[in-house]
Amino acid sequence: MYKRQIEVRLNTDYLENKAALDALADKIVYTGPIDAYFDYKLGTLEYRSVRFENELLDKPSFQGNAAVNYTDRETPWTRIIEHKWFEFGKDENGNDLPKTIISREYSSEWKPGDEPYYPVNDAKNGALYAEYKKLADAEPKVIFGGRLGEYKYYDMDQVIAAVLDRCESELH
């Protein structure tokens, strides 16, 4: 339980347990794909996905920074994350770490069954989303939020702020 008795359940697929979970709450915050919520009855929105390749390197640093984006056409990945720099490259005792782990992020086409990451911003998908938004507006108990629920590109700081603001206004 969290503040004001908001129950949080992890590793629970809302859509597989929708009836039981809906019965427990006055409001639902749904951040999954809006088209999935409505069982794709108007059609499937398009998304982009990503895949990751992880590598343990036998050296103390690869890029000296947590995240580096690559925007040139010649580089096949879009980003490299060097995880140790989120903790400033030190262990719990403040010692330098002798190895590093990197993750290369590759953009990939999305197909049903893949993890959707980013909405496809074009006229066709915008029009289909507008129709789903009408259905969503008719669901007063459900707050649709996030990249997938609003079918909108957000940086993570933006989506966290938007969801917190929305919850603040809806739940108080």
Task: Locate each region found by the language model.
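Short, small-residue-biased leader/transition segments that mark boundaries at the very start
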Residues: 1-2
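C-terminal catalytic lobe of FAD-dependent flavoproteins
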Residues: 115-172
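Mid-domain catalytic core of redox enzymes
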Residues: 12-135
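General small-molecule cofactor/ligand-binding pocket signal
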Residues: 7-11, 143
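Generic hydrophobic/packing signal
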Residues: 6, 31, 79-81, 159, ...
